């Protein structure tokens, strides 16, 4: 019963704090309780998330795929980089939204992933990749309405992601089809999903990122039952959370566990950052530069 009461509380609360203006405070749930040593914060340059004139730009394409686990046609947005060339291979970043979002949250609600990626490409700071922004709510009614059913559907999304979406992407676009060329990251609820799925399926994803990860994040001992396996198979475990965000503890407990067990793990404390796209844009900007290299 407690699990379902928590699910209801989280669903209502997080749905309320999402779907608002992109830069206002969201998700304030109390102070962090775990003491950790944060990694160095390096500020993004001014204008990293602003359109620039005179550079090549990518495109965002809405795709539809048949979901075997959900039993319906589902949608995702795909960012194709400037001068996408079907004759060459690309890596793939799966970028997840929060509990109040959908496949459009990153694109329309303030994340500007296409602009961030275009600028990184122009500066030669990222490896060749496409970015897939799915709907992480694995149920037939996958609208932003939320509710307890949606909370459960977020937990089931790995079946749809791994069983249907990834095969569709690898059949439709010119991408590599191995774990070393797949990364997963997300914001808030999507950050929790990314940590759960990325560490739970290390045969599928080599790079894992969590931006202000929500309370759906499993406890560290559940995420990492085999320390040696993570050390061997994971290439990057990277997190960021705002210093003024009460959800910091979700990331801090994982960072503390990793430090205690000698697992490479990064946790950035974004100065005075809150639960919004100011932090999440920084997360994408930073994480994208570290993967597939």
Each predicted region: which residue ranges?
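Positively charged n-region of N-terminal signal peptides that target proteins for export
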Residues: 1-4
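Bacterial N-terminal signal peptides
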Residues: 7-13
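General helical structural elements
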Residues: 6-7, 30
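Non-catalytic cap/lid and distal C-terminal segments of serine-dependent acyl enzymes
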Residues: 20-293
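Sec/Tat signal peptide C-region and signal peptidase I cleavage site
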Residues: 15-19
